[in-house]
Amino acid sequence: MPRKILGVIPARFSSTRFPGKVLAQIANKTMLQHVYERAGLATYLTSTIIATDDERVYTAAKSFGARVRMTRADHLSGTDRVAEVASAENAEIIVNIQGDEPLIDPAAIDAAVLPLVHEPDVLMGTLKKRIEDPREIVDPNVVKVVTDHAGDAIYFSRCPIPFDRDRSADTPYFKHVGLYVYQRDFLLSYSTLPVGPLERSERLEQLRALENGYRIRVVETEYESLGVDTPEDLERVSRLFKASILQGMGNG
């Protein structure tokens, strides 16, 4: 696989619900270090870099040997921050890896990358997972996605899609897993695309691509996204880390 593929982890210190969360400790490492190390296990990433506008994050990343770059502080989204880093790199494919998912599955990263490697006309990709908890279907904080037979997104919504008119028990629902892959040139032009009414209504940035006529390839995964948005989320993830460590000791 000759193409250069760069993983970028946007990492802000400021967070409305949980300031400094990327530097929160989980099993004697910062959350950011866990994300960086997990991303490094992905087979198809040529390299990984952390993008931040905060000296504290920069210093912490350097302390565990990460590649890290300071970016402008005025970016409106993580995508813009990733694009700034991508503009200075010669990678052909860019992966936007969330900095608050310390359990990110390297295999999920690889699965999202592959379509853009094999089909250069696919400009953007992401992931979906089948919903198992019925409560998530009606939860507006869980973004749903429907795709066509080729696996390209038809729509993303906070509403239950599709609408199950006959209340069929076997209607599958899928939630969006927020890892994005871009062909570099498309990423660099993304912020110049006009924002449409669907993106404004749903408050979902990925709808900008669909509203402007671009495909998004959506790969199904078994990876259960466990993002850390609150101190309570951190406690839950910390318990999972402790359980996995104890399990590993028991198997040793």
Curated annotation (Swiss-Prot):
Q: What is its main location?
A: cytoplasm
What general EC class does the enzyme of this chain belong to?
A: transferase
Which gene carries the instructions for this protein? kdsB
Keyword ATP-binding tagged: no
Q: Which compartments does it reside in?
A: Cytoplasm
Protein's UniProt name = 3-deoxy-manno-octulosonate cytidylyltransferase
Q: Which Pfam families match?
A: CTP_transf_3 (PF02348)
Give the catalytic activity: 3-deoxy-alpha-D-manno-oct-2-ulosonate + CTP = CMP-3-deoxy-beta-D-manno-octulosonate + diphosphate
Its annotated pathway reads: Nucleotide-sugar biosynthesis; CMP-3-deoxy-D-manno-octulosonate biosynthesis; CMP-3-deoxy-D-manno-octulosonate from 3-deoxy-D-manno-octulosonate and CTP: step 1/1; Bacterial outer membrane biogenesis; lipopolysaccharide biosynthesis
